[in-house]
A protein has these predicted regions:
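Extracytoplasmic thiol/disulfide redox context detector
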Residues: 1-81, 132, 150-164, 194-197
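Cysteine-centric redox/oxidoreductase cores and disulfide-bonded domains
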Residues: 79-169, 174-197
Length: 197
């Protein structure tokens, strides 16, 4: 029975990502819209390399560039599975951009806790616990997880990214419309930003 449920969820997810949806995509942004440098990160919340990038690069970049108005940062949802999709839905349950980024931080920091196993119900309990710890209500999170619009917005981001940028892996990092691949530590990333300032 568990195998049938797993197959059902996987098939449903794959079907959904092939649909073109009408809902407007909401990209999470941080920083000045007038910044000279725009950093777009296409990532999946279940991707270990995405978590490493976020944990080792994002906070330093925020302090050194985003908070100073030099860089505009965009988090583009590119979920690779149903668990990542649901985690993105919970992130978008928050009312403010600041709270959304707090949730994003915690999803990456606690990835090894919640993004394990194949039981989507257990995964949902774990991601809702993260939301509860950051003061999201259980009812609000349940409503968000049931919302087709929330899922459609996220899946639309993935579809648009695939069409425009031909994303092959996560994280994909684009700085001022130039793609950077491979392992990116902060020192390497800092040089990329400085070159674009």
């Amino acid at each position: 029975m568990k195998e049938i449920i797993k197959i059902f969820y996987t098939a449903t997810f794959l079907f959904l990502i092939t649909l073109t949806v009408e809902a407007e995509s909401k990209v999470l942004t941080l920083g000045s819209s007038d910044a000279k440098v725009t950093v777009k990160v296409f990532s999946s919340l279940t991707c270990p390399h995405c978590a490493t990038f976020h944990i080792t690069v994002f906070d330093k970049m925020k302090k050194d560039y985003i908070d100073k108005g030099l860089v505009k940062f965009e988090h583009h949802a590119f979920p690779l599975d149903l668990a990542a999709l649901n985690a993105e839905v919970i992130v978008r349950c928050a009312s403010s951009e600041e709270k959304k980024f707090e949730l994003l931080d915690e999803m990456y920091n606690q990835q090894r806790v919640w993004a394990v196993g194949s039981d989507i119900n257990k995964i949902n309990v774990s991601i809702k616990k993260i939301g509860s710890d950051l003061k999201l209500s259980e009812d609000n999170m349940n409503d968000c997880l049931k919302s087709n619009d929330a899922q459609d917005n996220i899946l639309n981001q993935r579809i648009e990214a695939q069409k425009k940028y031909k994303i092959k892996s996560t994280p994909t990092i684009i700085v001022n419309e130039k793609e950077y691949t491979g392992k990116v530590n902060y020192e390497k990333f800092k040089k990329i930003i400085e070159k674009n300032l």
